[in-house]
Design a protein with these regions (language model features):
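N-terminal Lys/Arg-rich, disordered targeting/topogenic segments
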Residues: 1-24
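Alpha-helical transmembrane signal-anchor/signal-peptide segments
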Residues: 46-66
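Extended hydrophobic/aromatic segments used for targeting, binding, or gating
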Residues: 61, 243, 249-317
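Membrane-embedded segments
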Residues: 72, 76-164
Length: 346
């Protein structure tokens, strides 16, 4: 009797674990995985499209700032010129330092051609002559910087600097650098975003950032040197071109189109401290520029203290004030299509 009753009772089926609703955490995890895979599949292009080389973007910002005087060059210009002091000596409202560490002549040409200064501005190009006359860019870093500065196809410039039009490889390299910078910025900023939701964490984050800012010093303003690699970064030298087939014609054309005054400065040279006083340029590039109405200021042989140099063309910070004063003297004295020698002031 007992066995027949128990046999007639219904038996509950075993529960199927897959039939239960998935926890919310699982769905969120799957959504996160899909998002990450989507970003990876897109090559982080959407994120990277808004990120630029900081060296290029800040130089562009300064050259288009509307400042009446602009310094354009590379780390040599950054080490030589104190923009605020130069503005005082020239009695102008502002001097913007738009130099880019590691820049060569094609980069300067790209800045002036694709990001023209305000009409009536004075553009002072200061870099060693062999850098200014550089032709084909020698390294991937140099090519990437040029591609970053271009806004439209520029056959004369890219043929000189790249050997032709911008290639897919150059664009891929640029996007790779942008993507890496964007992803790194997103990763490093994530803890701050999380901390912003927690007041206690936010206070600690702010304190940390304040301490870091105090250690690093103030961020450079519109007149200060651009951040980047230390002055004198070693580069593979580009082949020097004759003036007529270098970027000089492109620079002159860009200045004329922007209605800007162009002055080319030959920087201080530790090896040429005994250079003689001259009334005409000693090199072919200087003569070519003067013949086309461009002022040339030659600081070789100017009475600069020998211990002011840190390298061949670079100066210690302690030498910038004297160098800036000497440069201001030349910039005030030189006229259009004229040549001024700093050695004549000894």
């Amino acid at each position: 009797m007992t066995s027949s009753t128990s046999a007639s009772e219904p038996v509950e089926p075993l529960a199927d674990p897959w039939a239960r609703p998935a926890p919310k955490a699982l769905w969120l995890g799957l959504a996160l995985v899909v998002t990450v895979l989507g970003l990876a599949a897109a090559g982080v292009r959407g994120l990277a499209a808004h990120v630029e080389n900081p060296r290029a973007s800040q130089a562009v910002e300064r050259i288009t700032s509307g400042a009446p005087w602009l310094i354009v060059g590379n780390s040599v210009a950054q080490s030589v010129v104190d923009p605020d002091r130069l503005a005082e000596r020239l009695q102008v409202s502002a001097v913007a330092q738009a130099s880019v560490d590691g820049a060569l002549g094609p980069h300067v040409a790209a800045l002036l051609r694709h990001h023209p200064p305000a009409s009536g501005a004075t553009v002072v190009v200061l870099m060693p002559t062999h850098n200014l006359l550089a032709g084909r860019l020698p390294s991937e870093t140099d090519r990437a910087l040029l591609v970053e500065l271009l806004r439209w196809p520029d056959a004369p410039l890219t043929t000189l600097a790249l050997g032709g039009a911008v290639s897919p490889l150059d664009l891929w390299r640029r996007d790779r650098v942008r993507a890496r910078a964007a992803l790194l910025g997103w990763v490093t900023a994530t803890p701050l975003r999380i901390g912003a939701a927690l007041s206690g964490v936010q206070v600690r984050v702010d304190d940390t950032l304040s301490n870091l800012g105090a250690e690093a010093g103030p961020v450079a303003g519109p007149s200060g040197p651009l951040p980047g690699a230390p002055p004198g970064r070693a580069v593979v030298e580009a082949e020097e071109r004759p003036p007529e087939s270098s970027v000089l014609p492109l620079l002159v054309e860009a200045a004329e189109r922007a209605e800007a005054r162009l002055i080319v400065v030959v920087p201080f040279d530790r090896r040429r401290q005994d250079a003689p006083c001259r009334t005409t340029p000693e090199d072919e590039a200087g003569r070519w520029l003067v013949e086309r109405g461009v002022a040339v200021v030659d600081m070789r042989g100017a009475p600069l203290a020998p211990d002011a140099f840190s390298r061949e063309f670079h100066l210690h910070n302690t030498g910038r004030a004297q160098a800036t004063d000497l440069l201001a003297e030349g910039l005030r004295a030189v006229g259009p299509g004229a040549y001024w020698s700093g050695a004549c002031g000894r």
